[in-house]
């Protein structure tokens, strides 16, 4: 259990730390010796995110963030009409969906595009493998994503349920020595997964919420959990399965972020083909030949229009 530090002796020396929770502009920082304290940003633009490595200075009420170290990557989510970063320095993203209730393919596609844009490896976890018929239907729905090279991991996340232990063993191998952000809509089993992987997670979440003054049952905090005592593997939990921030992406970049579309762009007659109406379009030809899912192509058109409108403002 972390050692909480409400206040430290004032010191002019900078200290290293890891941001393990955030709520608004307040963050919880884990120090190099395992202590935790509340830190506040210095200035409006010095906003730290969960996963950030920072340099902080002790103050009377905790610490102030003096420097955010260079980030390997950033993941974004949507905030009204803007894209807003919410996690940094990830090795992979685990997108958890379930056989029931039926998942939104649009939300899944957006999450994958956000990961591709940030150069973060995505994994898809398909939960409720114990529901044979719905699971078979959901697995078929994910076949285009397997064809794109995305790994789909079957899971049965049910405390004490048949297949749960073997599911977790296989997943733990994927999480080993990595920082993984886990995302999923309501009903996908994200809370169950976290509680199975991290005994005492609920109590720790309550302590963090109290420390950040957000209330014990907050749903707005992004939280970092260590998966092992050696602190080599970590899981980041972010609330909900919100629309992913894609408005920072230029429309012309979109085909390269959708592997099934990108595969066929080299066959287009025109270098600036939008893949919507031009003659000699390799992407449209691939749709007609059944090499690209019609639903995926439809989503490409919808998102291209959305990004084109967003980039006008």
Predicted features and spans:
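Walker A/P-loop
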Residues: 191
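Phosphate-binding glycine-rich loops and their immediate beta-loop-alpha structural context
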Residues: 98-150
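Helix-rich effector regions associated with P-loop NTPase G domains
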Residues: 8-13, 48-53, 57-62, 69-93, ...
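Canonical P-loop GTPase G-domain recognition
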Residues: 131-188
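Short aromatic-glycine-enriched beta-strand elements
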Residues: 25-29
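Beta-strand/loop nucleic-acid-binding surfaces
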Residues: 35-50
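Structural detector for short beta-strands of small beta-barrel domains
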Residues: 12-23
């Amino acid at each position: 259990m972390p050692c909480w530090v409400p206040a430290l002796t004032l010191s002019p020396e900078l200290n290293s730390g890891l941001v393990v929770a955030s709520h608004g502009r307040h963050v919880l920082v884990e120090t190099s010796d395992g202590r935790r304290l509340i830190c506040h940003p210095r200035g409006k633009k010095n906003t730290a995110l969960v996963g950030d490595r920072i340099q902080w200075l002790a103050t009377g009420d905790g610490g102030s963030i003096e420097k955010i170290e260079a980030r390997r990557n950033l993941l974004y989510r949507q905030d009204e009409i803007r894209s807003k970063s919410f996690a940094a320095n990830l090795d992979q993203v685990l997108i958890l969906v379930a056989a029931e209730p039926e998942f939104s393919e649009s939300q899944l596609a957006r999450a994958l595009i956000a990961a591709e844009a940030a150069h973060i490896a995505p994994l898809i976890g398909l939960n409720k493998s114990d529901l044979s018929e719905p699971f078979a239907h959901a697995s078929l729905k994910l076949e285009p994503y397997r064809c794109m090279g995305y790994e789909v991991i079957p899971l049965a996340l049910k405390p004490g349920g048949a297949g749960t232990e073997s599911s977790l063993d296989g997943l733990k191998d994927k999480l080993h020595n990595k920082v993984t952000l886990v995302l999923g809509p309501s009903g996908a089993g994200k809370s169950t997964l976290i509680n199975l992987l991290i005994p005492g997670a609920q109590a720790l979440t309550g302590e963090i919420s109290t420390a950040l003054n957000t209330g014990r049952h907050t749903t707005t905090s992004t939280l970092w959990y260590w998966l092992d005592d050696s602190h080599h593997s970590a899981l980041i939990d972010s609330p909900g399965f919100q629309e992913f921030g894609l408005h920072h992406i230029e429309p012309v970049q979109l085909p390269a972020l959708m592997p099934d579309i990108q595969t066929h762009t080299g066959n287009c007659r025109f270098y600036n083909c939008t893949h919507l109406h031009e003659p000699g379009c390799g992407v449209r030809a691939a749709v007609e030949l059944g090499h690209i899912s019609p639903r995926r192509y439809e989503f490409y058109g919808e998102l291209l229009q959305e990004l084109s409108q967003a980039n006008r403002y």
